[in-house]
């Protein structure tokens, strides 16, 4: 199943944005605890 550039970019953003958000929260909570 070939994936066009728009579909690939949309999937990448759909996965990357929440992951960056969760990583940011994780780092924030860790820095607050220490």
Swiss-Prot record:
Pfam families tied to this protein: PsbM
GO terms of biological process kind: photosynthesis, light reaction
Keywords recorded for this protein, A-Z: Membrane, Photosynthesis, Photosystem II, Reaction center, Thylakoid, Transmembrane, Transmembrane helix
Highest taxon of source: Bacteria
Keyword Glycoprotein listed: no
Keyword Transmembrane: yes
Cited InterPro entries: PSII_PsbM, PSII_PsbM_sf
GO cellular component: a single term: photosystem II
Subcellular location: Cellular thylakoid membrane
Transmembrane segments: 7-27
Predominant location: membrane
Summary of the function given for this chain in its UniProt record: One of the components of the core complex of photosystem II (PSII). PSII is a light-driven water:plastoquinone oxidoreductase that uses light energy to abstract electrons from H(2)O, generating O(2) and a proton gradient subsequently used for ATP formation. It consists of a core antenna complex that captures photons, and an electron transfer chain that converts photonic excitation into a charge separation. This subunit is found at the monomer-monomer interface.
Family in the record: Belongs to the PsbM family.
Subunit structure: PSII is composed of 1 copy each of membrane proteins PsbA, PsbB, PsbC, PsbD, PsbE, PsbF, PsbH, PsbI, PsbJ, PsbK, PsbL, PsbM, PsbT, PsbX, PsbY, Psb30/Ycf12, peripheral proteins PsbO, CyanoQ (PsbQ), PsbU, PsbV and a large number of cofactors. It forms dimeric complexes.
The protein's name in its UniProt record: Photosystem II reaction center protein M
Gene name per UniProt: psbM
């Amino acid at each position: 199943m070939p994936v066009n550039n728009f579909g690939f970019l949309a999937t990448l953003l759909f996965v990357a944005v929440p992951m960056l958000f969760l990583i940011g929260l994780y780092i924030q909570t860790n820095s607050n605890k220490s």
